[in-house]
Amino acid sequence: MNADQIRGLKPTLTRYLKRFDDCFARCDTRAHLPVYVGGQLSDLPAKSCEPIALAAGVAPRTLQEFLSQHCWDEGRMRDRVQELVVRDHAGPNSIGIIDETSDVKKGDKTPGVQRQWCGKVGKKENCLVTVHLGYATGDFHCLVDGDLFLPESWSEDRGRCRAAGIPNEVVYRPKWQIALELFDRARGNGLTFDWLTFDEGYGSKPLFLQGLDDRGQLFVAEVPVTFSCWSEAPPVAHRPYRRGGRGRSRKTPRLRCDAPAPMSVKDLLKHSPALRDQPWVRYLVKDGLKGPMVWETKHTRIVMKNAAGLPGIELHLVVARNVLDP
């Protein structure tokens, strides 16, 4: 869309934003929302507070205070967005996307900032990270939730958290746990996904995969080549036993002595007859700007090694390689 088309949508945008009026306690605070959202949708080269405010003819400090000091009900706004998506865009073939965003930040005052992996620049950098849940169906897509990842170093320093305005109830949670909470909130508001998809940052976490399976959610996950699994479920002993005939009986399940060790996906591809002897199947994924993207794939069933080291859920494994860019 060009700038004229966006400006032509102003009446529609105004009506849409009116649906969030009850999320603000004060009318003067509420009035800044159209200014900020309109600036984000504009063709301004920079979309921070100052250029947005100057373009709208308001004082930059006013818009800065709107974002940093004024109060609104964030939870109600999030729930309202999800309810509108359910009402207007629910349908078949809906996909949920779990992903994270990292923003490079200088200094050490911004909540959650520290030197950590920054996907935006592809290396460790001083940045903050947020975990997001997106929704897509047909030609519609939007973000429906997100939350800040608070590193352990921050969580353990409550004085630093208070100085940054982080409430006491906000503590360190692994990113996969944040993702499950986003998913549960969306489901609680009636939003459903035919499939959920995410990269290996989440696909490598057995507790996350198990959590989705426990909730009955289908998913397509990227997993690393080190992902640990079996080609078929190994035998497990459930009866109590004593190690060496001494001590207290152990009652938790364990792998039987004759159980095979789990294998990485990389080793499974090399050594498992189910994959090793299977021919590659070629697919044209898409025609890109640099030419066609062609993948070759193999498929088999595997049993995931869970967080306790025991056989977990059964999964379909699709191994893919890029033929033209190996």
Regions found by a protein language model. Name each.
Residues 1-25:
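Basic, low-complexity segments
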Residues 28-30, 35, 39-108, 244-284:
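Electropositive nucleic-acid engagement tracts
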Residues 80-85, 170-194:
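Short, basic/hydrophobic alpha-helical segments
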